[in-house]
Regions:
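Catalytic phosphate/metal-binding cores of nucleic-acid and nucleotide-processing enzymes, i.e., regions
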Residues: 1-149
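Juxtamembrane, membrane-proximal amphipathic segments and lipid-exposed surfaces
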Residues: 150-154
Length: 154
């Protein structure tokens, strides 16, 4: 199972604190938290669903951050071992086959890091789009309320 599908299958635990939302995801025995805070000027627009969605995205991004760190460490270890093999083969005079399974593992480890970064970037883009669309919705509601208040005052 890929990391992305594993993250999507996680069951979020949502907690509401006044007008702020917290989401907890448990992945590989670790807890990852995401929070969404409601601005004091937007308290009348508070929505638990919107806050939970934002907090859920943030928790998923934190899982990716952690997995990227782990994958980068593994890739660095493999790359370091490969450089040691190359260095030692130059001293021994024994040629190293660059198509070996080991170098393939090195490149696969690096590819995994790049794939995780692309998926994390996709999640961040989705979150930005969600926030931008939500802000457009709030702006239209504010404008409508402003015109309604002006009509009442006339």
């Amino acid at each position: 199972m890929s990391l992305h599908s594993a993250i999507m299958k996680l069951e979020p635990i949502v907690e509401v604190y006044d007008n702020d939302i917290g989401v907890k995801l448990t992945y590989n025995g670790h807890n990852y938290y995401g929070f969404a805070y409601c601005h004091k000027e937007d308290k009348d627009f508070f929505s638990e669903k919107v806050g939970a969605t934002i907090a859920h995205y943030r928790a998923m991004i934190k899982i990716y951050d952690d997995e990227i760190r782990r994958a980068e460490v593994a890739a660095r270890v493999l790359w370091s071992a490969y450089k040691d093999v190359i260095y030692n083969s130059q001293n021994d005079g024994i040629p190293v086959d660059p198509t070996s399974a080991f170098i393939t593992r090195v490149f696969k480890a690096r590819d995994l890091v790049d794939r995780y970064k692309a998926q994390r970037a996709s999640l961040r883009t989705q979150l930005r789009e969600y926030l931008k669309n939500h802000e457009k919705c709030l702006e239209s509601i504010r404008a409508q309320r402003k015109t309604e208040n002006e009509d009442k005052n006339v």
